[in-house]
């Protein structure tokens, strides 16, 4: 729910209801353009399940009057499921926590999957990865990161993960490992469309070598994937830096139709 809390008197207390994909549901802040601008800015807050304050308008393209808008969210934090209690997982759980994810680290090996090793994780689970995934809740905002690098864990886990309506599935390993990793799921009936969802090798090419650098690489890919970013330097692009969210574009198309 977006509510005008500061601006010209005729706009005060106007509200706009937004859905999880940032498309508008009901109400208005003062016009279609202002509504679309607000929806675009609130997408990150909605994904993170956070409240916040945004500024809308003050220009001819959206609304001549500048509006201060308070965004109330009614959603839990998105989940990041990290499989494999390795050093990279410790750095990734810290980065995920920083980005507002509810982080779970899962590994079947009791000696490695301990809260002491992953202080930034909300949950540390000792279980076979595919069994835990089968029993836990996921949604379109969930990011699944497979760092186990072991076929006996990877294959059943990826087979399940790629069939679920999650936002991101990535797996660590070399290109050769990736090629081998695709064979077994195919034999088990995983479709080509499902395999195409797999981000492997995981992360963007940042030249990272350390666990911390690799965590930045992985989370950068997750962010780009969620917001349909290119992952390219902004200095190489043209046009607006902040593009409308996919849900906003869809809403605008429906309105135009």
Where are the predicted features?
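Adenosine-phosphate binding glycine-rich loop
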Residues: 172-257
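Short amphipathic alpha-helix with an adjacent loop that forms part of the alpha/beta core around
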Residues: 130-140
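Conserved SAM/SAH-binding loop
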Residues: 127-132, 152
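ADP-ribose/adenylate-binding Rossmann-like module
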Residues: 106, 143, 147-151, 159-185
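Short phosphate-binding/catalytic loops that engage adenosine nucleotides
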Residues: 101, 166, 190
């Amino acid at each position: 729910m977006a509510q005008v809390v500061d601006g010209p008197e005729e706009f005060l207390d106007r509200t706009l209801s937004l859905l999880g994909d940032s498309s508008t549901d009901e109400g208005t802040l003062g016009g279609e353009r202002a509504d679309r601008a607000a929806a675009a800015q609130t997408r990150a807050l909605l994904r993170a399940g956070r409240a916040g304050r945004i500024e809308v308008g003050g220009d001819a393209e959206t609304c001549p009057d500048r509006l201060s808008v308070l965004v109330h969210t009614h959603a839990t934090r998105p989940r990041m499921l990290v499989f494999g209690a390795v050093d990279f997982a410790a750095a990734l759980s810290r980065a995920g926590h920083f980005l507002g994810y509810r982080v779970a680290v899962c590994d079947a090996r009791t000696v490695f999957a301990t809260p002491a090793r992953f202080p930034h994780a909300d949950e540390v689970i000792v279980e076979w990865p595919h069994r835990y995934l089968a029993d836990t809740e996921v949604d379109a905002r969930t990011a699944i990161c497979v760092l186990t690098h072991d076929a006996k864990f990877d294959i059943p886990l990826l087979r399940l993960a790629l069939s679920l309506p999650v936002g991101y599935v990535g797996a660590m390993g070399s290109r050769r490992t990736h090629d081998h990793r695709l064979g077994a799921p195919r034999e088990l009936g995983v479709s080509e469309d499902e395999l195409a969802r797999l981000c492997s090798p995981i992360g963007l090419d940042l030249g990272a070598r350390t666990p911390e650098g690799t965590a930045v690489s992985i989370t950068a890919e997750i962010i780009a994937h969620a917001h349909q970013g290119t992952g390219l330097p902004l200095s190489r692009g043209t046009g607006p830096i902040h593009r409308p969210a996919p849900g906003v574009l869809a809403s605008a198309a429906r309105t135009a139709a």
